[in-house]
């Protein structure tokens, strides 16, 4: 039961943090590129890598990794925004968003793990 509470607590704070950062960034973004989701997902990839790489206990992994990072990052919004770019026939931004998210995300997860200690 404690494990579920850790995940739920982390998820609550992760979702609230994503909501606040996303709204703040969207108000300042003047381009077609979905910068809010991109930065949130890249930051989340790095932080999750760091959390796992640092070898924290299972409880902290559940709270911060599964809970907070699971709710903070957003795969579904990334896919929705990708489809919206395609529907608007904004192919160059679509390709940039797709490739940058995967390439930079994997790189940042790797860097996080390395800095975390693995």
Swiss-Prot record:
InterPro entries: FluC (IPR003691). It holds the Pfam family CRCB. Keywords: Cell membrane, Ion channel, Ion transport, Membrane, Metal-binding, Sodium, Transmembrane, Transmembrane helix, Transport. It comes from the Bacteria. The chain crosses the membrane at residues 1-21, 33-53, 55-75, 93-113. One of its GO terms (molecular function) is metal ion binding. Na(+) is not transported, but it plays an essential structural role and its presence is essential for fluoride channel function. Its main location: membrane. The keyword Transmembrane applies. GO terms for cellular component: plasma membrane. It is a multi-pass membrane protein. GO terms for biological process: cellular detoxification of fluoride. Na(+) binds at residues 70, 73. It catalyses: fluoride(in) = fluoride(out). It is found in: Cell membrane. Fluoride-specific ion channel. Important for reducing fluoride concentration in the cell, thus reducing its toxicity. Belongs to the fluoride channel Fluc/FEX (TC 1.A.43) family. This is Fluoride-specific ion channel FluC 2.
């Amino acid at each position: 039961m404690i494990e579920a509470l850790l995940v739920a607590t982390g998820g609550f704070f992760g979702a609230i943090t994503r909501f606040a950062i996303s709204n703040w960034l969207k108000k300042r973004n003047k381009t077609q590129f979905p910068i809010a989701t991109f930065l949130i997902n890249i930051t989340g990839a790095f932080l999750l890598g760091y959390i796992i790489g640092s070898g924290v206990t299972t409880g902290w992994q559940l709270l911060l990794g599964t809970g907070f990072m699971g709710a903070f990052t957003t795969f579904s919004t990334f896919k929705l925004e990708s489809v919206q770019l395609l529907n608007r026939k904004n192919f160059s931004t679509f390709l940039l968003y797709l490739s940058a998210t995967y390439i930079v995300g994997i790189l940042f997860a790797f860097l996080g793990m390395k800095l975390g200690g693995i």
